[in-house]
């Protein structure tokens, strides 16, 4: 598996361009993984569970991601966080939150993104924003409370000083 660390340069305080977060990932495993292209939204949190899936067997892991080779097509989401911008992509929609700005909703296209219409924003932004913040909040809390793994493993985790 070959995966990049990040996409091209961006300036989130000037313009929110989520295409800067598109990161290539290539799995080369002849005889194990057939050639193809995933159409689902995924993120770097999915890398380790996918590698574990390629190894086979059952794994008790605390990753918030999923095995991309076993995930349903079209499912998935990805977060982008830099400076004070939090972006969330799910399907063909993206929500972006920045301090001192109203929440933004974008339509994701094959060539980039387009701002959503006022009608789309009124209808779609509130439930998408709520889902985004719920997922982010749960992940953050599980991490802070070391509840992302079994109690036995949690006992061995070195905790951050308060």
Residue ranges of model-derived segments:
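Solvent-exposed soluble domains appended to multi-pass membrane proteins
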Residues: 1-162
């Amino acid at each position: 598996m070959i995966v990049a660390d990040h996409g091209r340069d961006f300036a989130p305080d000037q313009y929110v361009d989520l295409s800067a977060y598109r990161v290539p990932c290539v799995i080369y495993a002849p005889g194990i993984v057939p050639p193809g292209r995933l159409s689902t939204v995924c993120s770097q949190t999915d890398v380790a569970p996918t590698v574990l899936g390629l190894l086979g067997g059952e794994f008790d892991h605390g990753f918030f991601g999923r095995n991309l080779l076993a995930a349903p097509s079209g499912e998935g989401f990805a977060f982008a966080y830099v400076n004070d911008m939090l972006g969330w992509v799910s399907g063909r929609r993206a929500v972006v939150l920045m301090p001192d700005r109203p929440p933004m909703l974008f339509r994701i296209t094959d060539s980039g993104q387009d701002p959503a219409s006022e009608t789309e924003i009124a209808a779609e932004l509130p439930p998408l924003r709520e889902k985004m913040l719920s997922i982010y909040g749960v992940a953050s809390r599980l991490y802070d409370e070391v509840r992302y793994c079994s109690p036995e493993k949690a006992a061995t985790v070195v905790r951050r000083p308060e």
